[in-house]
A protein has these predicted regions:
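Intrinsic disorder/low-complexity segments
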Residues: 1, 125-159
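Nucleic-acid nuclease catalytic cores
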Residues: 78-126, 135
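Active-site metal-binding core of divalent-cation-utilizing nuclease and nuclease-like domains
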Residues: 25, 30-72, 111-124, 132-139, ...
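Conserved catalytic cores of phosphodiester-cleaving nucleases, focusing on short active-site segments
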Residues: 21, 65-83, 94
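Interdomain/boundary linker segments immediately adjacent to catalytic/signaling cores
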Residues: 1-20
Length: 159
């Protein structure tokens, strides 16, 4: 994943946060993110159906993710006071089911947006691209999130 590409997406997150601040409903941030991402040249789909199959049969047609950017990066938006690890697990499941490499859980209800953007990487892509799992390397993550990304990668390997 191109580092400049992910920086541009994160820049859109910062812009929405700087304009709106914390404390609004998730749906408001979602609409603002769609507008900001499109203004920056991204293709964005919202409330995308995530089909779940079991033994070849569709068993859950109504699971939905918040945003998918250029059919590559999933953004799961939150506006909560109590961030829970289940949000990262939820995003990881979306990444796996949609066959995407990278996603971010973003909690807009914070005083520091930089500390509230959580990268999640699909293990399938880590292995196929030769990422080091135990060598403290997460080369696709932006530098400002590298330690957070490394933690998430290592954590996702040991559920």
């Amino acid at each position: 994943m191109d580092r400049d590409y992910t920086y541009r997406i994160i820049g859109c997150i910062y812009e929405v946060y700087n304009q709106l601040g914390p404390g609004l409903l998730e749906s408001i941030y979602e609409k603002a993110m769609i507008k900001e991402l499109r203004m920056n040249g991204f293709e964005v789909r919202s409330q995308v159906e995530v089909p779940v199959y079991y033994k070849g049969e569709l068993i859950c047609p109504d699971l939905r993710l918040d945003l998918i950017v250029d059919d590559k990066i999933i953004l799961e938006l939150k506006s909560v006071t109590d961030f829970r690890s289940v949000f990262e697990k939820q995003l990881y499941t979306y990444l796996r089911l949609m066959n995407c490499e990278l996603g971010y859980v973003v909690n807009f209800n914070t005083e520091n947006i930089r500390e509230s953007i959580y990268p999640v990487v699909n293990n399938k892509f880590i292995k196929s691209k030769g990422f080091m799992i135990k060598g403290n390397s997460a080369s696709s993550a932006p530098d400002s999130f590298k330690s957070n990304a490394e933690h998430k990668i290592l954590k996702s390997q040991n559920p």
